[in-house]
């Protein structure tokens, strides 16, 4: 992360997850919510029996206070996180949610606390994925892979992570090479994806430690095998090498990332439609979206943020 980015971007963004058994996870919800609100921290944290997952943003001191609280809990003493910066607050509110799982794949008895793939550091990733004996798999969804991916990676074109297991089972050719290298945004989906692959009989299964975000942070652009931008689940929409904020916008009708060029399409209307969703929405849908967009515009005039923006 460059000093200039730090100086011009006042909000610290922390992406984190940790798989660990947390029997009394519900007891953390209220104090964590209060601590975040008191420190000006916003975002989403998911708590479950299997651990914690989420992304939060706020002033540096606020983020550090939340991380210190979490690491003071015995279960989360080994919690790791990834940092980036944002020029404006990328979240509207703070939500601490209780869940059955911290990432949902829909397959029973997959436990990353018991079996998981081999972690590969960002500095060693290029060597692994350049090996002709390695199949590289992007475990993210189609709207994420559309704006960036590693060269030569297989794209399952899934709409949700729940579709990933079926894609694997329908592609026996994945067994044709001895090594499988997998990656996702921050690493959490690969925890379950690699555990699933091991359960399906794949022996040499690897995943990028810290995900794409860690790779973009640590690997110089001139050495990078990453093409494009990385979709992130906040109002920045995408980040690039050095974790610099990307130039993508979000279509608030379909939640797909779009480029500045795509906003010149006759099918684009802010908050209403884009070339990705125009033909999949009805005129009634677009009328509803226009009404919402009108409310957003009114809220901005009043100096407020509409909750649906």
From Swiss-Prot:
Keyword Oxidoreductase: yes
SMART domains attached to this UniProt entry: RHOD (SM00450)
Sorted UniProt keywords: Oxidoreductase, tRNA processing
The protein's enzyme class: oxidoreductase
Catalytic residues (UniProt): 184 (cysteine persulfide intermediate)
EC code(s) of this entry: 1.14.-.-
Record-linked Pfam families: Rhodanese, UPF0176_N
Gene Ontology annotations of biological process type: tRNA modification
Reaction catalyzed: uridine(34) in tRNA + AH2 + O2 = 5-hydroxyuridine(34) in tRNA + A + H2O
Residues in Rhodanese domain copies: 130-224
Coiled-coil blocks: none
SUPFAM superfamilies, sorted: Rhodanese/Cell cycle control phosphatase
GO molecular function ontology, one term from the record: oxidoreductase activity, acting on paired donors, with incorporation or reduction of molecular oxygen
Similarity-based family: Belongs to the TrhO family.
Functional description taken from the UniProt entry: Catalyzes oxygen-dependent 5-hydroxyuridine (ho5U) modification at position 34 in tRNAs.
Entry-linked PANTHER family: RHODANESE-LIKE DOMAIN-CONTAINING PROTEIN 7-RELATED (PTHR43268:SF3), THIOSULFATE SULFURTRANSFERASE/RHODANESE-LIKE DOMAIN-CONTAINING PROTEIN 2 (PTHR43268)
HAMAP family, sorted: TrhO
The protein's name in its UniProt record: tRNA uridine(34) hydroxylase
Gene that encodes it: trhO
